[in-house]
UniProtKB/Swiss-Prot annotation:
Gene from which this protein is expressed: rpmG
Protein name: Large ribosomal subunit protein bL33
Organism: Marinobacter nauticus (strain ATCC 700491 / DSM 11845 / VT8) (Marinobacter aquaeolei)
Keyword set includes Coiled coil: no
Gene Ontology annotations of biological process type: translation
Gene Ontology MF terms: structural constituent of ribosome
Amino acid sequence: MREKIKLVSSAGTGHFYTTKKNKRNTPEKIEIKKYDPVVRKHVAYKEAKIK
């Protein structure tokens, strides 16, 4: 089943992206480099739960 997740910026800006992930195929937490418009750089985004 695909679940909604939140990707939170590691730069500490509070910026986040939302996406879906298949928990069966990727049970570990995702870490992706994406663009953070607050600091205007590509930074690591880590998976967090949507509350």
